[in-house]
Amino acid sequence: MFYDLHVHSCLSPCAENEMTPNNICNMALIKELDLIALTDHNSVRQIPAFAEAAKAAGIRALYGCELQTAEEVHVLGLFASPEEALSLQPWIDERMPDVPNRKDFFGDQLICGPMDRVTGEEPRLLLVSLAASLEETVGRIHEAGGRAVLAHVLDRENSVTNQLGFIPPGLPYDGLEIKASEEKQRVLDTHPWIKEDSTVWLVDSDAHRLVEISERENSMSEETFRRLWGDAL
C-alpha cells in the first residue's frame, strides 16, 4: 500500500494556495498512491471538504492534523473517520492562543467548501503552540479514537528529538515519522529502548506544494496497517 500521511492544505499558512482538497486528492491519484491523509497545522476545519474530495476521487483517506505541543513538538493525529477528527477541534480551540494571522507575513489560511470554493478563512494564526503538553496531546488524540505519530522525529525544527533531546521512553505514541528510510537506523542507534520490529515507521512528505506529495515509493504492508489501526478500519 503506497501512502503519504502528512500533507498540508491551503488552510496551513505555510502551504501554497494550490493545495486545495481536490487538487491534493487528484495529485495523489496521478502519483498512484493508495492512501492519503490531510494534516493541517492545529486545525481539522479542512476535513469536511477533503473527505468529500477523497470520496469523489475514489482514494482511500485518513483524516488528521499536525498539533504543536507546549514543548513545540509536532504530533500527527490520524483518524479513521472525519467525525472523529472533527471532534478534536473544540479541544484545539480551547488551547490555542488568540494570535491573529498576518496574511502578508505568514500566508493565507483558506477554508474550502465543495469544488474547492473558498468559504472562509481561519483568523487565528495556526503556527503556534497549544497549551497542552506532549503527553496530554497524545492522550487526547487517543481519546478521540485516533493514532498519534511523532512527526519528522529527526528534524532540526519542531521534532521531539530537537525539542526534548530524545524520544521519551514510555510515551504511548503509535508510530514514528521519518523523512527517509535511512533515518531509521539513526533513531535506533540513539534510542536503545525503541525496537525496530515493534515500531510502526512512516516515511511521509510533509508536502506544502502539490509537487511535494510523495511519489509511489513509500509503502506499508497490510499487516503494518492493521498493527496501526487494528479494527478501527
Predicted regions and their residues:
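Charged catalytic cores and adjacent phosphate/nucleic-acid-binding surfaces used
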Residues: 1-5, 9-33, 44-90, 125, ...
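Conserved Rossmann-like nucleotide-binding pocket used by diverse enzymes
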Residues: 37
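Active-site gating loops and adjacent loop-to-helix segments of metal-dependent hydrolytic enzymes
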Residues: 80-122, 166, 224
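Alpha-helix-centered segments that form part of catalytic cores
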Residues: 108-143
